[in-house]
Every structure is written in C-alpha cells, then in structure tokens.
Amino acid sequence: PNQKAKLELMATEAFLLFAQDLSGGILNPNMIDVNINVVPYRKDTNMLLASLTENLDVNSFFDEHIPSSNEYNALVTELRKLREISRNEYWGDLVPADVPLEVGMTHDNVPLLRKRLSKMGYPVYQTHPRLFDEELDAAVKKFQEFHGLNPDGVFGKRSIEAINVPPKTRLVQVLVNLERMRWNN
C-alpha cells in the first residue's frame, strides 16, 4: 500500500509539473540570458488540482491551461508540418543568391525557386519553367509576407536567405516561439 501511495504522489507531481510547463513554459528565461526580463506565470498547484477535480476530463483541463491565441495555434500547426517535413523530406535544392529574381525575368534559378516554394506549400504551376511569371510573383509575395519580409515580389538577398533556411532550423524557431508564448500565457 505504501508503494502504491508513493507512485500516486509521483504521478500527481509529474502531472502538475507538466501542466505548469504547458501553461508557463519549460525554461527559465533568465537561465537563457540574464537580459531577458520575463517572469513566466506559474499557476498555483492547488489551483491546478482544484481545476482538475472540478473537470475530470483531462483533455479539457489541458486545453484550459495552454495558450489559446490564434498565433499559438498557428505555430502548433506549423510545428506539426515541420516535424513531418523534417522526418520525410526536405524543401529541395537551395536557391543560389547570385541574382535577384523578379517578374518578367527568365533565369536558371527560377525552377529551383518554384520547386522549393511548391514543397513549402505555396502552389506554383509551371507554365514556362524558367520564367518568373505573375503566378510565381503571387506565391513569392505570400512567402515574403509570411516570413515578415517586404512583399514586393522581388526575390532578393533577404528572401533567398529566408527560403534557404532548412526545415529543422525552422522547427527550432517555432519551438522557441511557442516557449516564449507560454512564458506570457
């Protein structure tokens, strides 16, 4: 009986730590950098236990304690995609940074750009593989906007740097941003 009680206490403690990590993050921001002035909100364990006993549905309990913003949910969706991509494939060959690409140009780098954008989920159909056409321009603008770049359609140095980031690096960036959002939950 004593062993069973000890196991139950350990399971409860692990459950509460997990709930706190979900709601307030895993890492202490000051351990990463002393200049980070964020104090994550840690939910009181008594409040968490009371919340669980009121609502015996564990899924609802966790839903109640994780960040619920659209941005957080979008990052979780992106994380799932990136995990799948990182396991099974990559985004194609890198786009060389030798020349900026824009509408109306014909260049050997355009097929690489089309392929990489397509693998990243931006629909781009090939009418003339080497031609940077209006359709490719629309996909480039969406890519630029999604990555916080000026959506001007010119695929220059910053856009090329952004598209050439490997999926595993993007995955780490998403994980870091999810953690930051939990700190502010």
Q: Where do the PLM segments sit?
A:
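Auxiliary tRNA-acceptor-end handling modules of aminoacyl-tRNA synthetases
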Residues: 1-185
